[in-house]
Amino acid sequence: MSRKLCTLNFTLSGKQGSLVIRDIQLWSNRPTASKSTSELRGQFIQYVDLAKLPLWVRSTNMNTYRCYSTSATAQAYFKSKLRNANRGIVIELSDKVDQRSQEPAYLIIFREKTELNCFQVDLTMKHEFDGQVTKLKQEIGKTRASVSKEGSIDIIIQQSQQRKIGTKTKVYRNVHINDKRLQFNETLSKLILGGLRLRGISNSITDYQKLYKITFDAAEFTHRDELKRISMGSVEEVSFESLQETVETLLKLFTKS
C-alpha cells in the first residue's frame, strides 16, 4: 500500500529571479518506520542524461519514489523539462545529508513512461572510491620519497612522459574548445531558423539573411562572457534553455511590425 513520505519544494534560479516549484509529494510502496510526513527543501542543480550517469549513483536496493503534485506550475515545469525520457532533474536537498557519506543529499527526478519518479543518489561508492584514491596517493608519495639516487633515471623518464601527456592534453583541450564553439553555433543557427519558420518568415523574403545575421550576432554578444570562458578552457556550456530564451527575445524584438 502506497504511503506519502514527504513533500518537496525546490528553488529554480534564473535570469528572471527565483521560482519555487512547490507541492511535490513523494510516495512509497515500501513500509517505513515513521508515520509522519516531513517537508523537504531543495535547490535545482542541473539537468542530466540518465544514460550517462555512473553506475554507482543508483544501487540495486535503492528506493524509487512516485511523485505527484497538484500545483499547476509544477506540472507544467515537469511536462516541459522532462519531455526527453532519458532526462533527469538533479535537486540538492537543503536540510538533509547522506547518512552514510555525510555529504549533501541529492534527488534525481525523472519520467518513466507516464509516471513521475525520483530516487536519492547513492554516494556510498563514491565515498569509497575517494578513500581508495587518497590511500593510493599516500602510498605513491611514500614510494617516491624512498627512491634512491640509482632510481633517478626513473624520475627522468617519468618527467618526460608527463611532458608528452601535457602536450597531448593541450591538443585535446583545444579540440574540445573548438567542438563546444561549433556546437554553440549549430544550436544557435537551428534555433534562429526554427524561430523564423514559426513566425512564417520565408527565406525568399529580401531581408531574411539580414534578419538571420543580426539575430546570430546579437545572440553571440549576449553570451560573450560564457563564450570567453569556454575559449579559456572552462568546462561550462551555454545551456539550450538559455540560448533558446535569448533567440526568442531577440526575434520578438527584431520582428515587431
UniProtKB/Swiss-Prot annotation:
Intracellular or extracellular location(s): Nucleus; Cytoplasm, Cytoskeleton, Spindle pole
Function per UniProt: Required for the proper function of SLD3 at the initiation of DNA replication. Binds to SLD3 and reduces its affinity for CDC45, a component of the replication fork. Required for mitochondrial morphology.
One Pfam family from the record: Sld7_N
Record-given protein name: Mitochondrial morphogenesis protein SLD7
Source superkingdom: Eukaryota
Protein family according to the UniProt entry: Belongs to the SLD7 family.
GO biological process, one term: DNA replication
Subunit-structure text: Interacts with SLD3.
This protein's UniProt keywords: Cell cycle, Cytoplasm, Cytoskeleton, DNA replication, Nucleus
InterPro entries, per database record: Sld7, Sld7_C, Sld7_N
CC per GO annotation: cytoplasm; nucleus; spindle pole
Taxonomic path: Eukaryota, Fungi, Dikarya, Ascomycota, Saccharomycotina
